[in-house]
Structures are given as C-alpha cells and as structure tokens.
Amino acid sequence: MCVRRELANAIRMLSIDAVQNAKSGHPGMPMGMADIAEVLWRKFFKHSPTNPNWNNRDRFILSNGHGSMLLYSLLHLTGYDLSIDELKKFRQLHSKTPGHPETGETPGVETTTGPLGQGLANAVGMAIAERTLSAYFNRPDYDIVDHYTWVFVGDGCLMEGISHEVCSLAGTLKLGKLIVFYDKNGISIDGKISNWFTDDTVMRFKSYNWHVVDKVDGHDANSIKNSIEEAKSVKDQPSIIICNTIIGFGSPNKSGTADSHGAPLGEEEIFLTRKNLNWKYSPFEIPNKIYDKWNFVKQGLKLEENWNKQFHLYKSEYPALAEEYSRRIKKKLPTQWYKKTKDYIFNLQKNPQNIATRKASQNAIEEFAALLPELIGGSADLSPSNLTMWSKSSSITENLCGNYIHYGVREFGMTAIANGISHHGGFIPYTSTFLMFVEYARNAVRMAALMNTKHIFVYTHDSIGLGEDGPTHQPIEQLANLRMTPNIDVWRPSDQVETAVAWKYAIEEKNGPTALILSRQNLFQFSRNNEQIKNISYGAYILYDSKKPIDIIFISTGSELQITLTSAKKIAALGYSVRVVSMPSNNVFDRQNIDYKESILPSYITKRIVIEASIKDFWYKYAGSEGLIIGMETFGESASEEVLFKKFGFTVENIVNKSKILLKH
C-alpha cells in the first residue's frame, strides 16, 4: 500500500536521479516541494494529461524554474507524453526536458521560466485572462471559463523586484483564483538568506491585499490540504500559502544547506538518501503501484468530457457567444478582418494627415480593436502619452470584462504579465511605454521573443525628436537592441499608412512579438501607389526612384524619412540617379526572398547612405563598407527637436554634403 510520503518520494528520487545523470541541475527544490506538489496535483489540480491544451484546465506555473525536475516528474507520473527516457535525457540537446521549463518543448509546460519572478508575473497575467474571459463568456449555469492559476515560488522570486510590481497589481485587481505557494526554505545559492532577506512576508502581502496562509508545514499533507482549501474559499483576494520547507528534504548530509541547491548530490549521498527515505528501487525505477496512484489520465478525460457536454449545451443556448469563444481560443481572425483592414489602409493613403505615428497608432487601434474584442491593451502609466486608449477602452478595474489594463509604473511587470495573458489564450495583448523605458522591461521582452509570444509592444517617443526631456528619456541604443533580438519583428513607421500596415502585420503574425516604434512629433505623409502600399508589408520598399542606372541609394526609417527624401531629390537635381528606400522593418525585409531583396537593394550599388536617429553601428550590414551612416554616436541632450536634429546632423544640408562626398569617391 502506498502512503503519501512514498508518492512524494517518487518526485524526489526522479529529480535526484535525473540531476545526477545529467551531471548538473537543482535537486534541492524538487526534494523540498515534493509533498506540496503531491497534494496539489493529486487532490486539487484540474487538468487532462492526454490534452495538455484543454481550454479549461488549471494553469500550473513553476516560477522557480531551476527546480524543473519537479515539474517533469509530475508530468511523467500523471500521464503526459513525457517518457522515463526523456527524464533520463534531462538537460540534453533536443530532449523534452531542458534545464529550465520551456513552453512548446514539453507538453504541460505553460510558460518558460528560469529568470526568477517572471513565472509569477506570467501567472498574474493568466489569472487576469481567466477572470476577464469568464466575465465575458460565462452565463448562469454555464461556467465555460472557470479555472485556477497555481504558482510555485521560492525566496529568489520574492527577492526580485518584479514580484513587488505584479503582486501589488494582483492584490489591487482582487484576483481570487490566483494561489501562490511560497517555498520558504531559508536557503539560496549563497547560503542562509537571513543575512540578506529579512522581509516580513506576511505583512508585505497583506499590504498588497492578499490573503495570507502562514506557517504551513510544507511536509505535512493535512497542513497543505487545509491551506489550499482555505485559499480556495477566499474569492476576492489572491492567496499566498507560506510553506516552511527543508531544501533537499531526505538527504542526510545536504538537506537544509546550499549544497543541495544547484548541484548533483553525488553517488554516496544519493545512496544515503535512498536509505533514509526507504526507497528500495533502482535509479529511474518507479513501481506500478506508485504509477497507478499518480496516473490522472482517466480523471482528466472525465473532467474534459464534462466540460465538453456543458459547452455543447452552452452552444445551443448561446450560439453567437460559443462561436466567438471558439474563434478566439483557436486564434482565428474574424472573416471581415482582411477586407476591412485593407480598405482602411488604402483610405489612409487617399486622405493624408501629417500626424505623429503614435497618433496614427491610436487611430489604427480605434479601427482594428472594433473588429477584435480579444485585443487587450495597457500602458505603464503613460496612456495619454502613448495614445493607447481608444473610444471603447474599458478598464478591467472598473469592468470585469474590460479591454484595458492600467499597469501603473511597472514596465517589467506589465510586460511579463501580458506575456502570461497571451499564453493563457483568448487575447492579443499590447503594452506600451516610452522606448527608453524598454530598459526596465528588457528581460520580459526577451522572454516574449524566446517563447514566440504573440505580444505587441507599443514604444513611443522614439528618438532625440522627443526634445527637451533630454538624454534620460531619449533612446539611442534601444532600437538596435530590439532589432538584434531573435524572433522580434521591429517596425519604425514613417507615417500613418506605414503605421497601419505595421499594426495589421503585428496582429496577423502567428508567432512571436512585434515592437512598434513610434514618434512623439508630427510626421509628413508620403505619396504612394498601390504597389508601394503592398510592398510596405515586406519590410522595405522603394519610395522614390529618379532614373536608372542608380548612382546612390538612401535608406531611412521613421521621422528621418522626410529629410532623406528631400535630400535625395536635391542630389537628383544635380544630375545623379537616386533611390530612396523606406525600411520600416529590417527584420521582415531580411526574411524576403533573394530576388525581392536584390530588387530593393541591388548588391552592385555600393554607394549607400543610411539616415536614422539611433545608434549607427546596427546599420553597417545595409550600408556596406563603401556606404555612410548618419546616426547617433553619443547620448542626446536637452533641447528642442529642431535644435537637436541640427546638432546631430539630421538636416538636409548635412545629408546632401555627405552624399556629394560619397559620390565623388
């Protein structure tokens, strides 16, 4: 007969064996949290191992992702498509068990975790998504969206500043279906945390408006069970269950010490641990009696079957809602989307406006959000500056099925929360701040790229053109940083037409985040024919050709495109043949076929000049060894836009003079 401790020991021993086999990893956390995981996953966690993407499953987030073997053990034991051979391949190339959990690599992993605290932030986003969807779709007797978000966090997660940002917001939003287990073991890599982490966690979370369950014995099943039942009974607050645990539980010589945190226990200590836990089985051996107790396939299928029956009845009574729910979950765009957005873009070209691209972005949101109820926006306390609200924006603080989140001054938290909203499903999130402050959000931006998260970043005030606020607010190297991050498509449009195309592209893009880089100042709208409008979506296109053969190519983006075109025409007036290429998205352009790229930037034309008010270094791949770049080499200064553009060489006079020199060589 299996006792609960033996079931938890299966997690411990699989984790120990996998880490030892890989010769690296983190056994301490899985050993310490195994009892909590056993109670949660066997008695409370709602899921279907044969269908990891079942819509109404509970979400489980391992924010302390270094303890990944705990999650892999749970997935294996409960019946997911994760074999014992995959556990033996832990941390090996092309396995389903990478060192930290990665969504898309392992069935049952909801989000990629590892950078501490971000899993917690993703979980807040998932809880927001659950509550907002439930308010929108649920009807009396039909709880179509009804699930919990469960999170494991460690001391490190709560030390990270992002935990403050997201837990503060979660409490304000009263996310009652968010339940966090805090693995309070008092140990981190450097040793006992009492020397550097003495927060009163109870009072901290109470001040956030969280329900706190304190002094839970993390190795006692009844204590854990009672704490979960208490947390679930609280409907209008997120809950944190503070579990006192022993890191490396079961290891005679390394439990309770940093030695068990981030390295294999070693053969001798593993032998002693097996003996101490009365585990009589060989490495990676789990007896059938334990598998039988853990397996959740039948229960999962029953849960899913019951939900499917309910949804069938719901569909009969509320067919339009059911159809809309299915469309959003399947990530399909409305049938009228393509025609209406195309018509909108062509109409913009026919009705020119010289407006800032941040305003053009707001106009695009106004048009597109009316077609897409799944579009959920937000800003880090800069909504009036970013222009991210539209006429039907509704705050989720005031309206449970709203479509706008006031994140407060929490750039990092905002970005990671929206990653979670996206991974939950049913939404396309967009978030916004000044481009300069992407620095605060940087790692969550990178995680969005790593996870191929559909997330639209709206970054305004994109250059020294923002003016008098000075170098603290003027982005210089940020554009290059974003462009060089794999999987992010970066767009810096030059007018309202390019902005609308960029928004349309971002919404239609199936995988990965998109960054829209937008101006504070008004910009000139350019003339284009239908072919040019179509070619915007290829990332770069010919805006102007004087005659052939070409002597020089001008390449530019955003706010500098107007002075580039004016300069090029002056050079053309001197008898030279010039081409002006607008390159709103180099990432998208780079993915085009060789014929298209050659048609825009012929390789035999080596005299090229690039003009952009950002760091120069990025552009050499397009300018070439014989080309010239007019860009930024220093930080900006505090002055008006006009003064700064003149000081840093973004004038027609300077561009023309530099072009003449280039043409004479």
UniProtKB/Swiss-Prot annotation:
Co-factor requirement: Mg(2+); Ca(2+); Mn(2+); Co(2+)
Protein family: Belongs to the transketolase family.
EC number: 2.2.1.1
Residues that, per the record, bind thiamine diphosphate: 66, 114-116, 156, 185, 261, 437
UniProt xrefs under InterPro entries: THDP-binding, Transketo_C/PFOR_II, Transketolase-like_C_2, Transketolase-like_Pyr-bd, Transketolase_bac-like, Transketolase_BS, Transketolase_CS, Transketolase_fam
Known partners and oligomeric status: Homodimer.
GO biological process: pentose-phosphate shunt
Keyword Magnesium assigned: yes
Residues that hold substrate according to the record: 26, 261, 358, 385, 461, 469, 520
Keyword hit for 4Fe-4S: no
PROSITE patterns: TRANSKETOLASE_1, TRANSKETOLASE_2
Function: Catalyzes the transfer of a two-carbon ketol group from a ketose donor to an aldose acceptor, via a covalent intermediate with the cofactor thiamine pyrophosphate.
GO MF annotation terms: metal ion binding; transketolase activity
Residues with site note (Important for catalytic activity): 26, 261
Active-site residue list: 411 (proton donor)
GO CC annotation, single: cytosol
Residues reported to bind Mg(2+): 155, 185, 187
Gene this chain is encoded by: tkt
Catalytic activity of the protein: D-sedoheptulose 7-phosphate + D-glyceraldehyde 3-phosphate = aldehydo-D-ribose 5-phosphate + D-xylulose 5-phosphate
Protein name: Transketolase
